[in-house]
Amino acid sequence: MFTQIKNFLVLLMVITIAFPSACKTKYPPLRIGNSIGIKDMNYERLKAMKDAGIDCIEITTGGFISTKKPKTDAEITELLTRTKLAADSAGIEIWSIHMPFGKDIDISQTDEKIRKNSVALHMKVLEFCKILQPKIILFHPSWYLGHNERNERIAQLVRSVNELNPKVKELGAKMVIENMLGYELVRNEQHERPLGRTVEEVKLIMKQLPKNVYSAIDMNHIDNPELLIQAMGKRLKSVHIADGDGRHECHYMPNPCSGKGDNNWIKILKELYKAGYTGPFMYEVKTSEYKEFKDLYNCYQNLYQNFIDSNK
């Protein structure tokens, strides 16, 4: 009897030790990424990110697409070449490019002249993106809308996506469309919220887009983002990680790391794994939310461990 009890206790100990390892095999940790403006790109900064455990970046394009201080093509080429060299030297992958957005460069514009000009600008940016060799190119579906024009805007978005997607494919990248903030339809007397404001609207839009155009989900833009992850499934190819209240552009560090925000990160991670998501855990938080890059790494490790513990 004593031998049987001893064997049972040994077996129990083995199972207890092995379970966390098995759990981590089933749910391998994601790489960690961070959004960064191109003006902040230099080797020293990127090396500090890499040393802190950050493997990937998303580059925002506002730094070289500016109507106030436009750069020449030669200046942009030189800037992006230096950027790519710095990333490669630091061992950082350029995962994604966040394309420019704004009222006058809205690819859903019903004014066909503005839409065509917007597409032309995006085409030019994509040509420059060849230098950076990203895996993902992220687009906003729209700027703010006028009242009662959502169906027309969706049709214009679909038209623009069909024009831009072949260019994205030339780069060997995937095109993704981001969900937008919009807990209420109406913003003010002049405007409605952008396209992609609810789970239902994102589903409606994605059904009309080519199958090789994918979804990006901003966890700060919607209440219960796990429901949108669930709806997108394997069509989800990139994320923006931040916490918030689903009503404002908060861009907090995830709660509990910040003590702010309503997101349930255990549910979010659960749905990411169910969707087969293998891209990076790409932060898009305010720089005031962390003191050093290691805070981003430590926050993810905290969230990941909480998720693993929830599966025991």
List the predicted regions and their residue ranges.
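Histidine-acidic metal/acid-base catalytic patches
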Residues: 2, 24-31, 39-55, 116, ...
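N-terminal pre-domain/capping segments
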Residues: 2-5, 22-131, 135, 151, ...
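Hydrophobic core
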Residues: 13, 17-18
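Feature marks short, surface-exposed loop/turn motifs that line or immediately flank catalytic pockets
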Residues: 40, 63-65, 101-105, 143-145, ...
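Conserved residues at the C-terminal ends of beta-strands
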Residues: 60, 98-100, 140, 242, ...
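Short, flexible/disordered intra-domain loops and linkers
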Residues: 65-74, 185-195, 253-255
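Catalytic-core regions built around general acid/base machinery
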Residues: 76-89, 160-170, 231, 267-271
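Active-site acidic/histidine proton-transfer and metal-coordination neighborhood
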Residues: 88-90, 105-214
